[in-house]
Amino acid sequence: MNPYWSALVRDLKPYVPGEQPKLDNLVKLNTNENPYPPSPKVLAAIRGELGASLRLYPDPNAELLKQAIARYHGVGANQVFVGNGSDEVLAHAFQALLKQTRPILFPDITYSFYPVYCGLYDIAHETVPLTESFEIRIEDYLRPNGGVVFPNPNAPTGRLLPLADIETLLSKNRDSVVIVDEAYIDFGGESAAALVNRFPHLLVIQTLSKSRSLAGLRVGFALGEPGLIEALERVKGSFNSYPLDRLAIVGGVAAFDDRDHFEWSRQAIMWTRQWLSRGLAELGFEVLPSAANFVFVRHPRHDGAELAAALRDRHIIVRHFKLPRIDQFLRITVGTEGECQILLDALSELVAGQAAA
């Protein structure tokens, strides 16, 4: 430990991102990236911005991107906040809205950045257990709190909370902010964005990383009542005035303008998810219902960590979590049909081989 570290840094437990291996010939199914390329219109927009304009700072407010997002979701531009990926947007939301006198609430099995933000910003929190079937039970959140935050679909389980349940939570929990983290909503769920004009304490956060194939561009955004958005803007203005570069802004605008490519990509992933889920079930895996671009699975007779290691030996990377309740599960990104077939073939050999042993 370095003697120059502050007490805050000494006590931090940073988020550990999914591995980005520097190897060739990998079937990479560990970080929920889209297996298909971005829209050609996005690539054309980025190429068009490559030139002398890069000597200039980008628009600090990214107004063109805010307007594109507002048009898509049917809200005002003053109801949109943009940031350098949804993680940055979440970080600003924790600072701006969730540092209250009462603890905030989030699921015990959820996106592991939430407790990291709480540690970094000294935010009191309590975790709420998921049910035995890994579902969020709304009534467990109907108690005094400093805010509620959860992903929908949940990560890493992929389970979807119906929009009607979110509406119930918002109706009965009006004294604190509710943040719905919708990184995966485009793969089968109904967005809570439809509720932002009815509930002034709702903030919806989304990303272009997953359904729009732009994880490398880093664009996230929030939708909410203008007062909530202003709070995020105040934090942003105290941290980084230019979170989005010129390429991210024009690429993001083009992504929202090309609805045909977006629809094709997400439909392909949803079809492959169903096909992959059936194949895994035929191999004896328990497959949780998923509305995301990944599946969460375990095998009743085979250890999760051992399966992940054996797949890695075959140059197939999936995500394994050494956490209570889910240490036997694998989170598997939905890749192309070809990638998923390679995975199924490898698992078939492993399951059969271990059963014979």
Swiss-Prot record:
Span of the signal peptide: none
Pathway, per record: Amino-acid biosynthesis; L-histidine biosynthesis; L-histidine from 5-phospho-alpha-D-ribose 1-diphosphate: step 7/9
Residues with PTM N6-(pyridoxal phosphate)lysine: 210
Keyword annotations of the record: Amino-acid biosynthesis, Aminotransferase, Histidine biosynthesis, Pyridoxal phosphate, Transferase
A family per Pfam: Aminotran_1_2
UniProt cross-references to InterPro entries, sorted A to Z: Aminotrans_II_pyridoxalP_BS (IPR001917), Aminotransferase_I/II_large (IPR004839), HisP_aminotrans (IPR005861), HistidinolP_aminotransfase (IPR050106), PyrdxlP-dep_Trfase (IPR015424), PyrdxlP-dep_Trfase_major (IPR015421), PyrdxlP-dep_Trfase_small (IPR015422)
Gene Ontology MF terms in the entry: histidinol-phosphate transaminase activity; pyridoxal phosphate binding
Reaction catalysed by this enzyme: L-histidinol phosphate + 2-oxoglutarate = 3-(imidazol-4-yl)-2-oxopropyl phosphate + L-glutamate
GO biological process, one term: L-histidine biosynthetic process
Co-factor(s): pyridoxal 5'-phosphate
SUPFAM superfamilies: PLP-dependent transferases (SSF53383)
Enzyme Commission code(s) on record: 2.6.1.9
Assembly behavior: Homodimer.
Family named by the database record: Belongs to the class-II pyridoxal-phosphate-dependent aminotransferase family. Histidinol-phosphate aminotransferase subfamily.
Protein name per the record: Histidinol-phosphate aminotransferase 1
Source organism of this protein record: Methylococcus capsulatus (strain ATCC 33009 / NCIMB 11132 / Bath)
Gene name in the database record: hisC1
